[in-house]
Amino acid sequence: MSIQVFCDFDGTITNNDNIMSIMEKFAPPEAEEVKNRILSQELSIQEGVSQLFQFIPTNLHDEIIQFLIETAEIRNGFHEFIQFVNKNNISFYVISGGMDFFVYPLLQGLIPKEQIYCNETDFSNEYITVNWPHPCDHHCQNHCGLCKSSLIRKLSNTNDFHIVIGDSITDLQAAKQADKVFARDFLITKCEENHISYTPFESFHDIQNELKHLLEVKL
């Protein structure tokens, strides 16, 4: 049995949710209603996020990138955590509902690109279009956009020990099939509503300490 870690990006690896930061900075007020409908599950993630990015003109590309480079912060302990999982031969994947145009630059030099799964964006028209290269498989009907539970099934074996790290509604379906969940913020609320066991965290030092104990037990 091997340990596999599946980690969210926005609000998990980074301190802030970058999509929400983009919307607050660049989108019109109407985006707030769409965001609330996503969180209340009135809109699927795929439908809601597609609508959000249709508010953003493509000519803001460079300005958005610069804004995120200046404002996005990597969560405390992440660099050391990556060294830890590599040293212990633990498989690590970023499974992010975020967008390629900011996920790849912010993780450059930290995570190999082949271990990152995120959505793709098209800047060829007036407004940003989101493409969805990792859709739900036949086990999931939630219109996730990037389907984290489907990616877990694709990337792992049933006898692997699955760890999910996340912070929001977008991580709920993955949390449902994890052997261990590390949660913060809104994902804690959703785990409690769905009776999913979880360990709260604020830094990756917290997660690393828990994983050390887990490795000792597994050994």
Swiss-Prot record:
Q: Which GO terms describe its molecular function?
A: 2-hydroxy-3-keto-5-methylthiopentenyl-1-phosphate phosphatase activity
Gene3D superfamilies tied to this protein: 3.90.1470.20, HAD superfamily/HAD-like
Q: Does the keyword Amino-acid biosynthesis apply?
A: yes
Any single GO BP term: L-methionine salvage from methylthioadenosine
Alphabetically sorted, this entry's keywords are:
Amino-acid biosynthesis, Hydrolase, Methionine biosynthesis
Q: In which pathway does it act?
A: Amino-acid biosynthesis; L-methionine biosynthesis via salvage pathway; L-methionine from S-methyl-5-thio-alpha-D-ribose 1-phosphate: step 4/6
What are the EC numbers?
A: 3.1.3.87
According to its UniProt record, this protein's enzyme class is hydrolase
Q: What is the catalytic activity of this protein? A: 2-hydroxy-5-methylsulfanyl-3-oxopent-1-enyl phosphate + H2O = 1,2-dihydroxy-5-(methylsulfanyl)pent-1-en-3-one + phosphate
Please indicate if the UniProt record lists Hydrolase as a keyword: yes
Q: Which Pfam families match?
A: HAD
From which domain of life does this come? Bacteria
Q: Which family does it belong to?
A: Belongs to the HAD-like hydrolase superfamily. MtnX family.
What function is annotated for this protein? Dephosphorylates 2-hydroxy-3-keto-5-methylthiopentenyl-1-phosphate (HK-MTPenyl-1-P) yielding 1,2-dihydroxy-3-keto-5-methylthiopentene (DHK-MTPene).
Annotated protein name in UniProt: 2-hydroxy-3-keto-5-methylthiopentenyl-1-phosphate phosphatase
